[in-house]
Amino acid sequence: MKEFIINENEAGQRFDKYLGKLLREAPKSFFYKMLRKKNITLNGGRATGNEKLSTGDHVKLFLSDETFGKFAGVQETVARAHQKLDIVYEDDNILLINKPVGMLSQPADDKEPSLVEYLTGYLLESGAVTEASLHTFRPSVCNRLDRNTSGLVAAGKSLTGLQELSSLFHDRSLHKFYRCLVNGVIKNEKYIKGYLHKDEKCNKVTVQETETSGALPIETRYRPLEDNGTVTLLEVELITGRTHQIRAHLAGTGHPLIGDYKYGRRTLNDEYRRKYGLKSQLLHAYRLEIPEIEGRLSYLSGKEFTAPLPYLFQKILKEEHVEENK
């Protein structure tokens, strides 16, 4: 027999929808049959599956371990927190994590763990989630960064947090700021627009000034913080959030990111690689500003969160004399 107590993440849905998540490999006919035979009960009584679940409801499944395991499906291996996460902020609904360079934001295949698996491992170890609760709700990230871009990634710890924070990212309510080091000298703040087209085969984008079929509109704002006569430290506000937007948009203006071999200048990148061991673009999701918002996350209104630059990024800024001074 298996017993489950409905939590806040599971409440509000129909009982049959919940069972469909819990017994993901079972045909609907199976759990309707089990409901009729009272092999599945709700609060100790017979149920039809149409009931709306409430927090604290008791669900019992009078099934063998073998049957439950068969229909619940094999749970993928959770990567425990072998790599300690840099938690910038955490409450009952959300987390903000400072993702390091080299870590995937979301799973790309079955072999390499991503931030999602590390997050799940962290929450399991802290007791915030259980193996049982993961059958029906899995915490996940609300935004993605490229593997070799570091900085703030937001995650939903509860269903409310995941849904509402994802919505804020989707409708561009949040203000997202990056730090990057680019080739060339930039003296003035600028707002730039364009159209981005992605080549799925080579995972590379191009930016054009005029609209073409399949291209998506992009908007970027940047302001210089410091330069040394050769390179410039920028603060970039990502207004839209397209694939490789900052990297391709700045490269299109003649100021590619240092370390970016996909869109940048190999000769200069090789110089930084020899000098500092730099293998990827110097781009960091630095600050997240939350405006006045309504709903369950309204307590976050007006808050601002920052993630410190990685050590190598800081070292290069210091050695190249482009540390921020304003």
Task: Explain the meaning of each model-derived region.
Residues 88-89, 146, 197, 223-226, ...:
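Well-ordered beta-strand positions
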Residues 1-201, 216, 308-320:
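RNA pseudouridine synthases
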Residues 182, 221-224:
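Conserved hydrophobic positions within beta-strands
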Residues 1-33, 65, 80-85, 212-219, ...:
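Pseudouridine synthases involved in rRNA/tRNA modification
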Residues 203-213:
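Short aromatic-glycine motifs in intrinsically disordered, low-complexity regions
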Residues 48-52, 235, 280:
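Short, surface-exposed secondary-structure edge patches
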Residues 165, 242-250:
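Short beta-strand segments enriched for Tyr within beta-sheet-rich domains
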Residues 44, 229-230, 234-237:
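Short histidine-centered loop motifs in beta-beta connectors
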